[in-house]
Amino acid sequence: MRRYLQQGRGKLVGHRGRQGALVGFAATVLYLLTMDRSVSWWDCGEFIATGHLLQVGHPPGAPLYQLLQHLFTLFSFGNPMLVAPLSNALSAVAAGITVGILYLTMRELRVSWRGALVGAACYALCDTVWFSAVESEVYALAMLFCAADVWLMLRWRRTGDARMLPLVGLMLGLGVCTHLMTLLVIPALGLIYLSGRRMARTKPYVFIFAFFFFFIGLTPYAIIPIRAAADPPINEMRGSFESYLKREQYAKAPLYPRMWRERDREHWREWTFSDHGLAANAAYYITYQLGFMYGRYLMYNFIGRENEHWNIVVLYILPALLALWGLARHRRRSRWDFWIVMALFLMGGIILNLYLNHPCYEPRSRDYVYVLSLYALAVWIGIGADEVGGKWKTVILIAAPLTLLAGNWSDHDRSRCHSVHDIALNHLQSCDRNAVLITLGDNDTFPLWYLQQVERRRTDVEVYNVGLTGWSETMDIIASNMGHRPVYFSQYFVDRYADYFPGRLRCEGFCWRLVSTAGEAGDLEPMRRHIRDSIEWHITPHEYLPRVSRNFLRDWEQNTASIK
């Protein structure tokens, strides 16, 4: 037994480690080749701007991610056009390392190298993972810490090396400084400890060190109040540091009722038979929250989805069949290992879904929050690949990742995607000099922050997001600037609040100008001028257009349809 425990002690890089490094390197190359070369939608523009200049982003913050972003973007050497690619490269590298660690984790779970390779490849090529790996978001780095924690605990179980536990504590703390989803691995870590406590005996003081290193891992959070005190241009810490960490500016969803957001009442009946009562809430949870907001995402990744660009239905059900076969066979292999992987799957999926209590409807897909459950499914894919027999085994194992690669390549290769950058720039270009631009959501705000803060484009335009400044303060800003400076609204703002300004909105390019009279609103010359002189586009053949880009361009076409 002692010889088994000491097997591989102190050797973090052996033959198996080199295999994992090769798998991780291949995944990293794939992500670097297909990553976005500029800003992307949603939080990416905010993360690039706050990371590059060490500003304060939305609660509860991601200080370690921002510090690493800042480190990566230092290699731009003052070239602002390299900042976004370098920031995106952080996600690509983190996701690639995660794939390598997944391979090593499956080897620790006694999966053959062939099965581990198939499982790691299917994880690397699935929709959600690939999407997060090619843009500036926190989830790739957060999954790296989740994967590292599980792998290190499994190494501790096999080798009995007490040094692994403080390292697990450190990784857990650093993961919290990236995203709180890292805490979801704690039940699995506990099961690994219970399964190995008799073979890998550890003295009590080691656990004290592990807790100490966990708190050391939390120290990057100190940068949030320090930078907030410097009052940078982007500072989303309102009030105290405690309220920032608690995300008090956001609405909190209760565990019950499941139908809780009153403004969604008209949509509840689409998913259940009533808008109140325990039975109706249970039906809503099963149909919408568990089915539409979780089960649908699992099928997107391992069964199939409609390709958003070419409008072709591509089915790749083979990975899902391997996962189901691996799930069925895993418990026969090892009861402890089965429940360890099941803990990852449940905590990263069903239990997380229960906690989040998704409102009806979300403004965007939320598949990225369930990436830990996809990680667990990838382990079962590897085990399923191990258990496949017969003369078709080689064909099946090769076909599983290849179908994912073929199905996902077209809408995950963002190396030629410039639509986000161009649409954001055209918002700024649609404004006259020294204008005030009022925006509403993430997609008409964060890419503009990136352009102004990083590329220093149209810094004369002041951008105010009504969700951050508040309605009352926004009205004060409009009133104080009207007649002195041009005031513009984004399309998102106009869609929701146009009724507050009847007859006073004139379309100019991608924005709407607030004018004094209805007569001015009917003047089409400013629109023609912007189309002729201000609007800029990259001419990129075969560029993939994300759904948000298509929606913006659809609105643009509708606004310009009357101008010939």
Regions found by a protein language model. Give the residues of each.
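ER/secretory pathway lumenal C-terminal domains and tails of membrane proteins involved
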Residues: 92, 135-136, 140-143, 155-163, ...
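N-terminal membrane topogenic signal
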Residues: 8-22
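Extracytoplasmic catalytic/substrate-binding loops of multi-pass membrane glycan-assembly enzymes
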Residues: 35-47, 57-69, 290, 415-419
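Transmembrane-helix motifs of polytopic, lipid-linked glycan transferases
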Residues: 89-110, 148-152, 321-326
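Loop-to-helix entry region of an early transmembrane alpha helix in multi-pass inner-membrane enzymes
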Residues: 63, 67, 77-100, 132, ...
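Short hydrophobic/aromatic helix or loop-helix immediately within or flanking a transmembrane segment
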Residues: 50-80, 92-93, 293-302
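Transmembrane-helix signature of polytopic, membrane-embedded enzymes
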Residues: 17-20, 102-125, 334-343, 347, ...
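Membrane-interface interhelical loops and short amphipathic "cap" helices
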Residues: 41-50, 76-82, 128, 356-366, ...
